[in-house]
């Protein structure tokens, strides 16, 4: 691979797509993984009838569009829309010709086999890329933190995973998936704001609530104590101005919303919280490596960006683990993009260059080549 032809790194998340060039320290393009279609045909005069909008443009015209996310729980469910998102990534965001650059894509751990084959097929057949590779998101996050051993708790918009990794290899038998992430927290915040008398219902209003969540929510170190504080004083109240100028006030919702990560019963789910899931994942590993996992617990993804989450994880895992165990929660400041950053690091390593699946290999073997070359 020539040096002057930089590889493209595309991290397709359920909520946001992060894209850029290998070797960069941050993605050039970050936009919502949304495809919007007009709700009403033919009323938009002078807009030049487009049948679909992607990303920020869909976001800004959301009032007249129906918004759909083609990636649910980390896994692509709508390939036609996914193709639109990739097309938008290459041609509008990065402004590159995909047939000139190798492309590194990311996938959720435990992604169905058919999915990675379909990704491979679209890259080679629709976009004619010269080479491509599919990497597991959590492994990339660990690389970005400068480690090869540790457990990654990766929580984005659509799905949360705990992935133990030893010497660079994910341990599939110990990976746990939790279908509870940012989007569920946004929905939950919509619900508890409704109880306060504010009404948010449409897909467009959901985006407003997501913004409230990102700006004002935090994780309480002690939930019961925080609820007491919120009940007895107004010190935790914050206000937020809606796009129409109306100002709303939120109090205990600020920490009740992300508390669902630790108590999924708030959402009517029977699963364990993220702390217990992390602990269970570690317990599924060989007894000899657990110490290394406890001492290298790495948080990754946008849903780990709440203030207070690392301290709370430290507290919860300490109470679950053996009392003598050293526990360290690593929460890098750039963890929102650590999957992308790990991909950028990986794709620019000289030792990685022989790992790419080339167009020639694809033509000889078909989509199943991805299982042999990408782990």
Curated annotation (Swiss-Prot):
Annotated positions of the Methionine (R)-sulfoxide modification: 44, 47
PROSITE patterns: ACTINS_1, ACTINS_2, ACTINS_ACT_LIKE
Entry annotated with the keyword Nucleotidyltransferase: no
Catalytic reaction(s) noted: ATP + H2O = ADP + phosphate + H(+)
Single GO molecular function: structural constituent of postsynaptic actin cytoskeleton
Stretches assigned to coiled coil: none
InterPro entries recorded: Actin, Actin/actin-like_CS, Actin_CS, ATPase_NBD
Keywords: Acetylation, ATP-binding, Cytoplasm, Cytoskeleton, Hydrolase, Methylation, Nucleotide-binding, Nucleus, Oxidation
Residues the record lists as N-acetylaspartate modifications: 2
The UniProt record lists the keyword Hydrolase: yes
GO cellular component terms attached to this protein's record: actin cytoskeleton; actin filament; cytoskeleton; dense body; focal adhesion; nucleus; plasma membrane
E.C. number(s) listed in UniProt: 3.6.4.-
Note: In vertebrates 3 main groups of actin isoforms, alpha, beta and gamma have been identified. The alpha actins are found in muscle tissues and are a major constituent of the contractile apparatus. The beta and gamma actins coexist in most cell types as components of the cytoskeleton and as mediators of internal cell motility.
Subunit structure: Polymerization of globular actin (G-actin) leads to a structural filament (F-actin) in the form of a two-stranded helix. Each actin can bind to 4 others.
Name under which the protein is recorded: Actin, cytoplasmic 2
Organism: Danio rerio (Zebrafish)
Gene name, Swiss-Prot/TrEMBL: actbb
């Amino acid at each position: 691979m020539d040096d002057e032809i930089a590889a493209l790194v595309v991290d397709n998340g359920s909520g946001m797509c992060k894209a850029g060039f290998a070797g960069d320290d941050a993605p050039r393009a970050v936009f919502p993984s949304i495809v919007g279609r007009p709700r009403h045909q033919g009323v938009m005069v002078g807009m030049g009838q487009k049948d679909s909008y992607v990303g920020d443009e869909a976001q800004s015209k959301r009032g007249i569009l129906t918004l759909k996310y083609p990636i649910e729980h980390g896994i692509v469910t709508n390939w036609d829309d996914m193709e639109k998102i990739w097309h938008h990534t290459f041609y509008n965001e990065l402004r590159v010709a995909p047939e000139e650059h190798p492309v590194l894509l990311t996938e959720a751990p435990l992604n169905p086999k058919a999915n990675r084959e379909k990704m491979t097929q679209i890259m080679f057949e629709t976009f004619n890329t010269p080479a491509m590779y599919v990497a597991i998101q959590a492994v990339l996050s660990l690389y970005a933190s400068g480690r090869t051993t540790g457990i990654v708790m990766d929580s984005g918009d659509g799905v949360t995973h705990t992935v133990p990794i030893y010497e660079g290899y994910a341990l599939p038998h110990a990976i746990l998936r939790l279908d509870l992430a940012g989007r569920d927290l946004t929905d939950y915040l919509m619900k508890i704001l409704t109880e306060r008398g504010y009404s948010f219902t449409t897909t467009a209003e959901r985006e407003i609530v997501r913004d409230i969540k990102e700006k004002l929510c935090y994780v309480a170190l002690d939930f019961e104590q925080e609820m007491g504080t919120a009940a007895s004083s107004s010190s935790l109240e914050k206000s937020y101005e809606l796009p129409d100028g109306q100002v709303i006030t939120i109090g205990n919702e600020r920490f009740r919303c992300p508390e669902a990560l630790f108590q999924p019963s708030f959402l009517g789910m029977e699963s364990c919280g993220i702390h217990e899931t992390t602990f269970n994942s570690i317990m599924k590993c060989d007894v000899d490596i657990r110490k290394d996992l406890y001492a290298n617990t790495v948080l990754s993804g946008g849903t780990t960006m709440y203030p207070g989450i690392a301290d709370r994880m430290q507290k919860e895992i300490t109470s679950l683990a053996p009392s003598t165990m050293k526990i360290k929660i690593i929460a890098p400041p750039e963890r929102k993009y650590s999957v992308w950053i790990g991909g950028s690091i990986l794709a620019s390593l000289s030792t990685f260059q022989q790992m790419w699946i080339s167009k020639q290999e694809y033509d000889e073997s078909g989509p199943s080549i991805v299982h042999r070359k990408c782990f």
